[in-house]
């Protein structure tokens, strides 16, 4: 059992030695030199200015695009307004022409009614003449 205990102790010592080798030693954080900080700040401000300029340019371009779209939409609505005015004018002209034709259309309706009445009278006359003819033939046979 003593040999087993010594083996366990030896294994633990080996593991402890490996753990120490795996641990890195921390170095003290040192501040960069003043010149490095100044250069880094300049670089940061330069890159930030470039970034902000890009963002502002993109926003400005978006607004210009929106302005152009609004102008085109306005022009399209003006065209549609002109078309609507022309349609309205043409409709008024057609209504005036229809009003001018209305007496003639009324006359046509009256004539159509008279023709229908005349046609009915012709059918009645035809029927009456057929009756007379039938009576005449009947009297002739006697």
Curated annotation (Swiss-Prot):
The lineage's top-level taxon is Eukaryota
Q: Where primarily located? A: cytoplasm
A GO molecular function term, named singly, is: gamma-tubulin binding
Pfam families with a match to the protein in the record: BLOC1_2 (PF10046)
Q: Which InterPro entries match?
A: BLOC1_su2
Query: Coiled-coil region(s) at which residues?
Result: 79-127
Q: Which UniProt keywords apply?
A: Acetylation, Coiled coil, Cytoplasm, Cytoskeleton, Lysosome, Membrane
GO cellular component terms, A-Z: axon cytoplasm; BLOC-1 complex; BORC complex; centrosome; gamma-tubulin complex; lysosomal membrane
Task: For the region Disordered, give the residue spans.
Answer: 1-33
Q: Which example biological process does GO assign this protein? A: lysosome localization
Q: Which compartments does it reside in?
A: Cytoplasm, Cytoskeleton, Microtubule organizing center, Centrosome; Lysosome membrane
Q: Where is the composition biased (Basic and acidic residues)?
A: 11-33
Where are the N-acetylalanine residues found in this chain?
Answer: 2
Per its database record, what is this protein's job? Component of the BLOC-1 complex, a complex that is required for normal biogenesis of lysosome-related organelles (LRO), such as platelet dense granules and melanosomes. In concert with the AP-3 complex, the BLOC-1 complex is required to target membrane protein cargos into vesicles assembled at cell bodies for delivery into neurites and nerve terminals. The BLOC-1 complex, in association with SNARE proteins, is also proposed to be involved in neurite extension. As part of the BORC complex may play a role in lysosomes movement and localization at the cell periphery.
Which family does the entry's similarity section mention?
Belongs to the BLOC1S2 family.
How does this chain assemble?
A: Component of the biogenesis of lysosome-related organelles complex 1 (BLOC-1) composed of BLOC1S1, BLOC1S2, BLOC1S3, BLOC1S4, BLOC1S5, BLOC1S6, DTNBP1/BLOC1S7 and SNAPIN/BLOC1S8. Octamer composed of one copy each BLOC1S1, BLOC1S2, BLOC1S3, BLOC1S4, BLOC1S5, BLOC1S6, DTNBP1/BLOC1S7 and SNAPIN/BLOC1S8. Interacts directly with BLOC1S1, BLOC1S3, BLOC1S4, BLOC1S5 and SNAPIN. The BLOC-1 complex associates with the AP-3 protein complex and membrane protein cargos. Component of the BLOC-one-related complex (BORC) which is composed of BLOC1S1, BLOC1S2, BORCS5, BORCS6, BORCS7, BORCS8, KXD1 and SNAPIN.
Q: What is this protein called?
A: Biogenesis of lysosome-related organelles complex 1 subunit 2
Q: Which organism is it from?
A: Macaca fascicularis
Phylogenetic lineage: Eukaryota, Metazoa, Chordata, Craniata, Vertebrata
Gene name of the encoded protein: BLOC1S2
């Amino acid at each position: 059992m003593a040999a087993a205990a010594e083996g366990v102790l030896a294994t633990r010592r080996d593991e402890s030695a490996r753990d120490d080798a795996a641990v890195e030693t921390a170095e003290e954080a040192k501040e960069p030199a003043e010149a490095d900080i100044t250069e880094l700040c300049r670089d940061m401000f330069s890159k930030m200015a470039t970034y902000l300029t890009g963002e502002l340019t993109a926003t400005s371009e978006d607004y210009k695009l929106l302005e152009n779209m609004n102008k085109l939409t306005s022009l399209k609505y003006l065209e549609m307004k002109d078309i609507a005015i022309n349609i309205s004018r043409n409709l008024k002209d057609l209504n005036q022409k229809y009003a001018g034709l209305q007496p003639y259309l009324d006359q046509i309706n009256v004539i159509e009614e008279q023709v229908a009445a005349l046609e009915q009278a012709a059918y009645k006359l035809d029927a009456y003449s057929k009756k007379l003819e039938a009576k005449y033939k009947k009297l002739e046979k006697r």
